[in-house]
């Protein structure tokens, strides 16, 4: 039992900085929304529309690069640190290629925005302007993620946290300058948020690169000291590992976007209640998401050391800690749901609906925690293809259709409205949690030679 407590301490030591980094990232989005809203409601709406297109695109690239973390962790655990620099260099090449693809998509996002039903022309113009400013930050963001994944693969999660807060602190004054036009800069309104955020991503990358080059613990890993051409074999391996993660993230983000669209015709009260519950549950999701990143590092490191038993200890401890955190957040949600809803809105009908939906959110928090930590475990085992199939099946084959039937039809029960979609979330996330755990057990029961051979690829 002692080894599980020791492992839990190590996991939390890795996870807490990741949690704080996520908080900083979320706060940046909050600052953009508030400061754009202070300029005008139209600019705030433009930032919201632009962000809804930016997030799926950039998270696809982010997911692709997550493959680097278990690769670096495994090489570090096996004592092959001399090979890490080559993997990271190829990670930068991959980030560059994906950045170009994302920038092309975002530059042409005007076609998506203009096709929206009854959208105001001025709003559409501002949303396109915001995206065309923000897209120049895509390379900076993805390069930052490569450097961050290198650090996290080496069990250094604090640098990502520090750079996240540097980005947040820089974002506020730069937003002010470009939104309102100070110090000789043009007054851009909501578009200025895009300029500021793009600039901040490059600042975060430059700061992280400076830290990596200065850190004593990484002096033997010199990624920038020699140029290396794209290595097709390494790039293909990173894509093979990262593409299923990227697609899983994309399907998860688009699921919630589709549900938001399906809820929108139900009326202002339903939309507001749904959005409040979704926003709060997203904040709670930061805890298991960060723990999943820590579990990936620990499992990858243990497999690199050649110890499948210790990898199992890391995996089981991660699930146990995740369930404990989820029970705590679920109890907090149940007890404080009305007070939480009142922080967002004081309309009694909205508060009542949001409180009811948060009760359903509390139910699925345990499943959500298990499934996301299970995904982190499978990343550590480099079994990323399963993540894609499980996520797609749970969300799009089971969760969304069942939610649609419960929310908008009378086929099973009388129409439940937004609560039906949240029941669908419970079905989807619980299914994902069960399948993730079954897959984990299947992998762990394989002979050690097969597990270590897969991890070493």
From Swiss-Prot:
Topological type in the membrane: Multi-pass membrane protein
Keywords in alphabetical order: Antiport, Cell inner membrane, Cell membrane, Ion transport, Membrane, Sodium, Sodium transport, Transmembrane, Transmembrane helix, Transport
Transmembrane portions of the chain: 11-31, 53-73, 93-113, 127-147, 160-180, 191-211, 243-263, 276-296, 316-336, 350-370, 387-407, 418-438
InterPro entries: MATE_fam (IPR002528), MATE_MdtK (IPR050222), MdtK-like (IPR048279), Multidrug-R_MdtK (IPR022913)
Signal peptide: none
Subcellular localization: Cell inner membrane
Superkingdom as given in the UniProt entry: Bacteria
GO BP term, example: xenobiotic transmembrane transport
MF (Gene Ontology): antiporter activity; xenobiotic transmembrane transporter activity
Main location: membrane
GO-annotated cellular components: plasma membrane
HAMAP family in the record: MdtK (MF_00400)
Job of this protein: Multidrug efflux pump that functions probably as a Na(+)/drug antiporter.
Protein family: Belongs to the multi antimicrobial extrusion (MATE) (TC 2.A.66.1) family. MdtK subfamily.
Protein name: Multidrug resistance protein MdtK
Organism: Klebsiella pneumoniae (strain 342)
GN (gene name): mdtK
């Amino acid at each position: 039992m002692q080894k599980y407590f020791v492992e839990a301490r190590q996991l939390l030591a890795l996870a807490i900085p990741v949690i704080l980094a996520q908080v900083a990232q979320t706060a940046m989005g909050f600052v953009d929304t508030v400061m754009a809203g202070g300029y005008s409601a139209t600019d705030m709406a433009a930032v919201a529309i632009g962000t809804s297109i930016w997030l799926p695109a950039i998270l696809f690239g982010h997911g692709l690069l997550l493959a680097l973390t278990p690769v670096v962790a495994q090489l570090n655990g096996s004592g092959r640190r001399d090979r890490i620099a080559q993997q990271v260099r190829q990670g930068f090449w991959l980030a560059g290629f994906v950045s170009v693809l994302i920038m092309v998509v975002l530059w042409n996002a005007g076609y998506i925005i203009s096709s929206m039903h009854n959208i105001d022309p001025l709003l559409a113009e501002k949303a396109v302007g915001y995206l065309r400013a923000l897209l120049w930050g895509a390379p900076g963001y993805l390069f930052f993620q490569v450097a961050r994944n290198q650090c996290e693969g080496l069990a250094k999660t604090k640098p990502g946290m520090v750079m996240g807060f540097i980005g947040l602190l820089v974002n506020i004054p730069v937003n002010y300058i470009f939104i309102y036009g100070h110090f000789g800069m043009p007054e851009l309104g909501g578009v200025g948020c895009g300029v500021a955020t793009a600039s901040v991503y490059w600042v975060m990358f430059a700061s992280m690169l400076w830290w990596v080059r200065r850190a004593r613990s990484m002096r033997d890993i010199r990624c920038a000291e020699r140029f290396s051409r794209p290595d097709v074999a390494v790039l293909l391996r990173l894509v093979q590992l990262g593409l299923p993660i990227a697609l899983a993230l994309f399907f998860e983000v688009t699921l919630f976007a589709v549900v938001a669209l399906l809820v929108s015709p139900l009326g202002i009260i339903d939309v507001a209640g749904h959005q409040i519950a979704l926003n709060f549950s997203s904040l709670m999701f930061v805890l298991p998401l960060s723990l999943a990143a820590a579990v990936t590092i620990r499992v990858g490191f243990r497999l690199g050391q050649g110890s499948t038993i210790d990898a199992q200890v890391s995996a089981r401890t991660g699930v146990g800690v995740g369930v404990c955190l989820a029970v705590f957040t679920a109890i907090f949600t149940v007890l404080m749901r009305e007070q939480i809803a009142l922080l967002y809105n004081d309309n009694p009908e909205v508060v009542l609906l949001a409180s009811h939906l948060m009760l359903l959110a509390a139910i699925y928090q345990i499943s959500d925690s298990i499934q996301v930590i299970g995904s982190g475990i499978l990343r550590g085992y480099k079994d990323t293809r399963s993540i894609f199939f499980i996520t797609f099946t749970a969300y799009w084959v089971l969760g969304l259709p069942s939610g649609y039937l419960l929310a908008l039809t009378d086929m099973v029960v009388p129409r439940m409205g937004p609560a039906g979609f949240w029941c669908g979330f419970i079905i989807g996330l619980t299914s994902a949690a069960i399948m993730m755990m079954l897959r984990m057990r299947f992998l762990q029961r394989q002979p050690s030679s097969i597990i270590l051979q897969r991890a070493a690829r």
